[in-house]
Amino acid sequence: EKLAALNEAKRVTKPGGYILVAYIMNEYSVITYAIKEKHIKEGIEGGMLDESFHCTEKANDLYSFVRLEDIEALNAQAALTREKIIAADGAANYIRPFLNALDEEEFDMFVQYHLSTCERADLMGASAHTVDILRVCGDSE
């Protein structure tokens, strides 16, 4: 389904145009739901997580969880060029109660921190969401 959606987006986008794709990241789900909320055993026993802790289709009927390598494979299969990928929320979901307690100036500093780290590959996979900014190559590109 993901590849079909990317190919359809590519079909209706002009050459040189952009496609923005939002993803829910696998590791965020494992850390928050499976480990933090103590569903790890049932997740493994129920086949919701594979041996590498990748969420399977059984994990959720509504959402699909991906890793960076899944995103890169989809882009390659769809022959789309990445301009940039960013962590939409980074650490925010992990520290939400602390963020809610910040004053306005402190929160602005957190936003500055997030903007300075949202493209770091070493932090990307742990974000709850990513946005992949892709370009449709034209005939001359």
List PLM regions with ranges:
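C-terminal alpha-helical "lid/dimerization" subdomain adjacent to the S-adenosyl-L-methionine
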Residues: 40-63
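A short glycine-rich, Lys/Arg-flanked "PGG" loop and its adjoining helix->strand segment in the class I
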Residues: 3-18
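A structural signal for short, well-ordered beta-strand segments and their strand-loop junctions
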Residues: 20-23, 81-87
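Short catalytic/ligand-binding loop motif for oxyanion handling, primarily in non-cytosolic enzymes
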Residues: 1, 28-32, 91-95
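A C-terminal cap/extension of S-adenosyl-L-methionine-dependent methyltransferases
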Residues: 84-141
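Short, glycine/charged-enriched secondary-structure capping and boundary segments
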Residues: 3-5, 34-37, 100
